[in-house]
Structure formats: C-alpha cells, structure tokens
C-alpha cells in the first residue's frame, strides 16, 4: 500500500516521492496482500521517440525562484491534501488521554513490541497509549498534529537517526498553534 500511495502522492503533488526501505523493514517477514504492477502511461520508449523538453522544469536561476513559488503555492498543499484525504498517516487511540507517542511508520513494530514488553500493548497491536504513525514524514500535516496533541500534556517522539528533524518541526507546529504540549524525544531516547 505504501508504494502505491507513494506513487499516487507523487502524481497528485507533482513532486518526486522516495520510499525508504531500511534494514529494520527489510528483515520483517509475514504475509500481506499484493496487487499487479501498473505500467506507466509514459514509457521510456515514448520518451526516446517523442522527447518533450520544458526548460522551465530545469532548476537553474531564474527558474529556481519559480519552482520554489510553485512548491509553496501548489505542490505542498496538494501533498498535504492527498495525505489527509487518503489517511496515509495513522492514528491508534486508547484510554490514555493526556499523552501520546508520535513515530515514523517504519518504527511501528519496534515501538509496539517495546510497549508490549512494558505491558502497555498486546501482540495484536492494541496499545494503551495513543499512537500517531507518520507513514509520510514530509510534508508533516500541521492539522493532524494539532488534533492529536490538543488536550495532551506530553508527547514522545520516536525518530530514527540524526538530527531530530521531526521533533524540531513538531515544536514549531505546536508553538505556532499556541499548544503547550510538552515534547520529548532525543532527550529521553538514545541518540541513534
């Protein structure tokens, strides 16, 4: 599903989308439904036989300014709209209302297993702590963060790698919205 939605997101926002397959994801095993591959409407053969050049798509000055304006006015809002409409990021709620965990999608199984060891989740994915799973980490959807964090005293960010890009962005989103939810992440968790 992530691959299919990634391609759809790319088309909806006219932006390249990257699917990151990390070591942790590559070592997971199990069963999942698949779909047939879909051939592209425009093939390599088409590109060779009927090349189309749009010099405005080449990112060199002065076109770079135009590209930046297009990103802010068109592509970014289109990506956010697509993410929200297709519910690509996931929310898992529970009885705990005053705190939650925000995590990257690829870390879901590891976080759930850690919660299970602590007695805060079961093997079937039922967590006693609300989870906001970011299956798309860029762009972040401000409205989803505001909804998830409203009324919560604290938030733990589980972010892989360095630096703490997501954590910094969440701070900015919440402070601009005047939400005083405390945000913790790299200060509580190992640095790598």
What function would you assign to each model-found segment?
Residues 2-192:
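Flexible, low-complexity linker and terminal segments
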């Amino acid at each position: 599903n992530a691959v299919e939605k990634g391609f759809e997101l790319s088309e909806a926002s006219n932006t390249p989308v990257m699917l990151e397959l990390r070591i942790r994801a590559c070592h997971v095993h199990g069963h999942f439904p698949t779909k047939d591959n879909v051939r592209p409407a425009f093939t390599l053969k088409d590109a060779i036989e009927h090349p189309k050049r749009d010099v405005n798509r080449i990112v060199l000055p002065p076109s770079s300014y135009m590209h930046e304006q297009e990103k802010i006015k068109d592509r970014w809002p289109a990506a956010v709209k697509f993410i929200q409409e297709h519910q690509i990021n996931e929310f898992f709620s529970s009885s705990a209302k005053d705190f939650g965990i925000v995590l990257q999608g690829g870390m879901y199984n590891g976080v759930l297993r850690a919660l299970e060891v602590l007695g805060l989740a079961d093997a079937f994915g039922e967590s006693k702590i609300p989870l906001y799973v970011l299956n798309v980490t860029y762009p972040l959807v401000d409205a989803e963060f505001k909804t998830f964090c409203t009324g919560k005293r604290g938030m733990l960010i589980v972010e892989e790698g360095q630096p703490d890009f997501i954590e910094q962005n969440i701070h900015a989103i919440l402070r601009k919205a005047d939400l005083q939810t405390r945000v913790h992440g790299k200060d509580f968790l190992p640095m790598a």
